[in-house]
Amino acid sequence: MANLKVIGVDPGTRSFDILGMVDGAPLLELSFPSEVVADNPSYIVDKMLEFSPDIIIAPSGYGVPLKRIDELTPKDRFCLTLELEKDKNRIPVLKGLQEMVDILKEKFPETYFIPSVILLPSVPEWRKFNKIDMGTADKLAIGVLAIYMESLRKNISYKDVSFVMVEIGYGYNAALLVKDGRIIDGIGGTLFPGPSFLSIGSMDAELAYLLQNFTKETLFRGGIKDIIGNINDIDEIEKNPHRGKAMLAFKEGILKAIYQLFSIYEPETIILSGRLTRNSFIINDLIDLIKNKTNKEIVILKGFAKKVKEAAQGSAIIGDGILGGKFKDIVDWTLIKEATGNVLSYIKIKNEANFY
């Protein structure tokens, strides 16, 4: 299809990014504070539709098997955000994302939703038991971008690409293991063995039990910001005299995630991506630590766009590939179209798992 126009998005904790591509080349790059999603989701939809796309890859949250918007079931909608009734409307951005889905369903039927890591057939079933978050749909998209960029950088085929990738974001950290060009394991933001800027990462189950009024908002707490206690943004970390132990927990968590994935397979390359990689104080120290501990090649994922974040680029790649464009081969190889099940499929605590 000539002049194939694709929209990919990154529904980040801090910003909502849009990438428009034509025949695989970036043409439109927009970034909005995430508050805009909460306050005016129709404005963002209108901006996407001004591009006259052939396909939009919508914010897919915890993911569903590849589906057009008119194929989504009520359970699929629940699985996008995993909000219980008691938490509805407590987090404005999540409310805005659900409203955006409603608007897209009405205005643009060629909207698609993509899977998260746990739904991929390349991840063995036994790694999925009693897990939900092995990497959200946006983390899968970043992984696809990383596979593509590594194949270019090394001039090799997708099937020869292997790496550990760590996404170091504002809200969450996450890690993926790629072997032979396919994602085979992942550690999502709510399973990560150390804090991100906002989030606690993995939580002691006894602590979860004691937090009787556990809400969705709790998942955005307990990170560097709360450990230090008197900062509001990433750039304030460097000058804060109380940062020391918080940053040790942050860096050790990233090392633990890398070695956790190394226990399955140990590639020679570690890729770092995400908002915090653009903070020189944080990333330079982290690269030195990882190099000294692992003796691996460290690569910062740059992508091919100038402004928007990696997940928007990866989701645009997926959209292009779905329609048989430039990136068809990488979408086919990564088995995105073969994703099955739902993010609750592998919960084995039967008597308790009445989520939906």
Predicted regions and their residues:
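Phosphate/pyrophosphate-binding loops at sites that engage ATP/ADP/AMP, CoA/4′-phosphopantetheine
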Residues: 46-55, 153-157, 255-270
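Adenine-nucleotide phosphate-binding core of ATP-dependent small-molecule kinases
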Residues: 217-268
